[in-house]
A protein has these predicted regions:
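Secretory/export targeting leaders with adjacent low-complexity proregions
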Residues: 2-234, 242
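Conserved helix-loop functional segments at active or binding sites
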Residues: 237
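Hydrophobic alpha-helical bundle architecture
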Residues: 241-247
């Protein structure tokens, strides 16, 4: 256990805003008995700092070797720049669920999340990332929008949702709609294994920089991850497990 005063930056954060987010989460989470009481308390205060300090306990985390340093990954909502129409600048499609994608429990789709497509009388695994990218004229693929950066589109798929600022000035929210059934593979592992980026320095920014230094290899590296994510237009920003908007 540690006092909140030992958490660097805790009291510098906007804890009143954090309290408002907590209240919204309580609309769903208060159904859990262990959270019902604290959710009720939250409705009767606007003092975020006092609320969290009075109702929660901070703990310091250690790994199995008693080290107190480690890596915690977090979600971020990507912002891409795009257009509803394909242009010379905006040429990378953000696809909807393909028209030919099917769900089936046939043996041929074992290991592919039961996701495939019908070819003749057979149901086969759905196309890999490389195959999808090589066939932009596929009539089964329809774009929600087009964006100007292939690498940013890749990381939009990794995150599963994000925002596209259109050339009209409007913001388009896109959310996860489905996937091609292929296994996700981290391209970060490629950079670490090939000693291009150290394990300690790996990040989205570091990966982008490394890709841009080797433009001729971008497609080959991105295609290491055969998984391809499809999107839908969303009414709001990204939601979490409680189906409330992440902030």
């Amino acid at each position: 256990k540690v006092p909140f005063s030992q958490i660097k930056g805790f009291f510098d954060d906007d804890l009143n805003h954090a309290l408002e987010v907590f209240k919204k989460d309580c609309q769903k989470s208060q159904r859990y008995e262990e959270l019902k009481n604290v959710c009720q308390k939250a409705q009767h205060t606007n003092d975020g700092a006092m609320f969290f300090v009075s109702n929660f306990q901070a703990y310091k985390l250690y790994d199995n070797n008693s080290n107190d340093e480690g890596m915690i990954t977090g979600y971020y909502e990507p912002l891409l720049y795009g257009s509803l129409k394909k242009t010379q600048r905006y040429k990378y499609p953000v696809y909807k669920i393909p028209k030919d994608l099917v769900l089936s429990n046939v043996n041929s789709l074992q290991g592919y999340k039961n996701i495939g497509k019908k070819v003749g009388k057979k149901i086969v695994p759905y196309d890999t990332r490389a195959s999808i990218e090589k066939n932009p004229n596929n009539k089964n693929l329809e774009a929600i929008a087009y964006v100007d950066d292939k690498i940013d589109l890749f990381f939009l798929q990794v995150q599963g949702s994000g925002k596209i600022q259109l050339d009209t000035g409007e913001i388009l929210n896109v959310g996860y709609a489905g996937q091609n059934g292929r296994e996700y593979k981290s391209i970060g592992r490629y950079f670490i294994d090939n000693e291009i980026i150290s394990k300690e320095d790996i990040s989205v920014q570091a990966i982008k920089e490394a890709l841009l230094k080797n433009p001729s290899k971008i497609d080959d590296i991105l295609n290491i991850n055969e998984s391809y994510v499809f999107f839908r237009v969303a009414d709001q920003g990204a939601t979490g497990a409680l189906n409330t908007v992440l902030t």
